[in-house]
Amino acid sequence: MKHIAEAHRYIDNAKEILSTKAQKEDGLYHDKKYVKMAGNNAYSGVLEALDGFFGLKKKGRKSVEWYQEELGKMDRKMLLNFRVAYDTLHLAMGYDGNLSVKVSNAGLEQAEAIIDWVEMKQGVVASN
């Protein structure tokens, strides 16, 4: 499950960027550039885990709608988690650079929940 280790590495990198470069003070980050970097890293981790789970090759990326459709067929709760991760990590952090520490923490928690779900699902599949 190389893709799971890689997904966790993306999340760890996002956390490192936020803790060392984004300058947290009073519940806010002060450097939008690093919040954007962290959001993009974390969202890439989510996609890395899902790509490995769905057996996608590295060339090209599926649309967010494709991921939503595939997750919707399998697990409605995980579909909702993915939508929150997309909105928080990709849009609010990655594009807008939302400076709220609470927003960043919520996005990272969603990312970890998705990666853990993929890891659990693959463990179940591997044991069958």
Regions found by a protein language model. Name each.
Residues 1-128:
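Terminal alpha-helical segments
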